[in-house]
Amino acid sequence: MAEPVRLGRKRPLPVCPNPLFVRWLTEWRDEAASRGRHTRFVFQKALRSLQRYPLPLRNGKEAKILQHFGDRLCRMLDERLKEHLASGGDHAPSSPSGKKRASKGPPAQVQGSSMPVPTQPQAGSTNAGYWPAQNSGAREILLQLYREHLNSDGHSFLTKEELLQKCAQKTPRVVPESSRPWPALRGLLHRNLVLRTHRPARYALTPEGLELAQKLAEAEGLSTLNTAFQPEEHHEESPVPEAILSEPGTTEVGVQQRPLELRPSEYRVLLCVDIGETRGAGHRPEMLRELQRLRVPHTVRKLHVGDFVWVAQETRPRDPERPGELVLDHIVERKRLDDLCSSIIDGRFREQKFRLKRCGLGHRIYLVEEHGSVQNLSLPESTLLQAVTNTQVIDGFFVKRTMDIKESAGYLALLTKGLERLYQGHTLHSRPWGTPGDAESEAKPSTNPLCSLLTFSDFNAEAVKNKAQSVREVFARQLMQVRGLSGEKAAALVDRYSTPASLLAAYDACATTKEQEMLLSTVKCGRLQRNLGPALSRTLYQLYCSHSPLT
């Protein structure tokens, strides 16, 4: 006789063996996300790795065996564990079987230490163990919605404008100054703690969010909110930026940041080195060793354009973790001869120069570094010399040639000292992107452009290579793929025909094929206002009007 089929699970799903560590990593990730820091990705990777690990961990040091757990993160877990125990946390260890040990039992000891292991609460749902960090954006949103829920005269919901205005009044620093949609609100929506309805959007607490908000209110001594509710005063001097009021997931737009002023004794000049200069095979890390040997104050960052820039960094910032920084008006692109050859061949050479011209900095330096024998390169020396000469004469860059990496580092050290002397005694001011003083702006330059500078966040954000582009920008990039069509010529073409559709319409309006071929030949290009010429005009006609394969 066949055995009856058993339905359902044979055993319950295993509980999380390290819920305390999961909760703390989640808090750190959400706090980093609410402040727009890239460390949220580090915490997210570590959290995924920990959630896949089936065994309990007694301390942070044991977590080092897991992927994405470094020395610093392990130390953070150990320090948080000590704080938890010092504040009277439960000392009973978690059990792999999920059964709780009797409360009278002796506390377990951490391996190699006399410190007992705290009980880590079991996670029963997706939000189990989630506790927004103190002064974080997520915490303030939940508390503001809880206040509105308890207000008998309210609607139990807030619009986004009302919500963020209240958050800005209560804790101004939790409202980000970046141009991205507020990640704290997006995270709460993802966790199903906040519900969004209607258009324009209304935000209210879900049952899970209400339960968590009540616990947060009790922890902050706000249990009497329902009897002592007072509306927030309106402060006109601290409006919420419009970009923050956009819906989560909308396109990124510029934000008018708070003006930054650095007096002569309030900043230092710091060299920023692109992270690409510290990676890869060969002698790339040697640049950092040379800068350290020469005692050049520097930092390594991801630069979206250029290899070296200088910033005036605030020495006594309000937020030590995010000091104010203004980018000085100098940028360096470093090229070894072998890299110069490859960039000319694959087209990066022209594109990089085009992006450097649009970066907003006025003094552009092209640092060409010798490397090996010229005879071993893929292009003849005359071609390289012509490219470097064009960069200086036509593009207006300052070209500096060095023999090796040591001479390049020495040149950067001299530039750093020179900039320190140049800006000594000057008061520096921030300016928004595209305002007078910007190298890309057509407006009249400001009276003191030397001290009217971009913030580092604006500079790096505008230089992002793969950001969303308009049709005009994509059209210009497409035109630059044609041999002999430089950035200046592409700019002249898109000034007359801003989209491919407008160019095709102009071709359709021509009476004869000859007229179509010569349509673009008289377009004025560059500073000398020379004609584009019949050859390029004919090439572009063939590209956009030929129905057969190009030959």
From Swiss-Prot:
Key word Hydrolase present: yes
Coiled coil feature spans: none
Region called Helix-hairpin-helix (2HhH), residue ranges: 471-545
UniProt family annotation: Belongs to the XPF family.
Gene of this entry: Mus81
Residue ranges of the region described as Winged helix domain (WHD): 131-230
Name of the featured protein: Structure-specific endonuclease subunit MUS81
Subunit architecture: Part of the heterodimeric DNA structure-specific endonuclease complex MUS81-EME1. Part of the heterodimeric DNA structure-specific endonuclease complex MUS81-EME2. Interacts with BLM; may stimulate the endonuclease activity of MUS81. Interacts with SLX4/BTBD12; this interaction is direct and links the MUS81-EME1 complex to SLX4, which may coordinate the action of the structure-specific endonuclease during DNA repair. Interacts with DCLRE1B/Apollo. Interacts with RECQL5; this interaction stimulates mitotic DNA synthesis. Interacts with CHEK2.
A single cellular component GO annotation: replication fork
Purpose of the protein: Catalytic subunit of two functionally distinct, structure-specific, heterodimeric DNA endonucleases MUS81-EME1 and MUS81-EME2 that are involved in the maintenance of genome stability. Both endonucleases have essentially the same substrate specificity though MUS81-EME2 is more active than its MUS81-EME1 counterpart. Both cleave 3'-flaps and nicked Holliday junctions, and exhibit limited endonuclease activity with 5' flaps and nicked double-stranded DNAs. MUS81-EME2 which is active during the replication of DNA is more specifically involved in replication fork processing.
Species the sequence originates in: Rattus norvegicus
Entry EC no(s): 3.1.22.-
Catalytic residues in the record: D274, E277, D307
Phosphoserine: modified positions: S95
Region described as Disordered: spans on this chain: 85-131, 231-255
PANTHER family reported for this sequence: CLASS II CROSSOVER JUNCTION ENDONUCLEASE MUS81, CROSSOVER JUNCTION ENDONUCLEASE MUS81
Ranges annotated as biased composition (Polar residues): 110-131
Subcellular location: Nucleus, Nucleolus
InterPro entries in alphabetical order: DNA_pol_lamdba_lyase_dom_sf (IPR027421), EME1/EME2_C (IPR042530), ERCC4_domain (IPR006166), Mus81 (IPR033309), Restrct_endonuc-II-like (IPR011335), WH-like_DNA-bd_sf (IPR036388), WH_MUS81 (IPR047417), XPF_nuclease_Mus81 (IPR047416)
GO biological process: DNA catabolic process; DNA repair; double-strand break repair; double-strand break repair via break-induced replication; mitotic intra-S DNA damage checkpoint signaling; osteoblast proliferation; replication fork processing; resolution of meiotic recombination intermediates
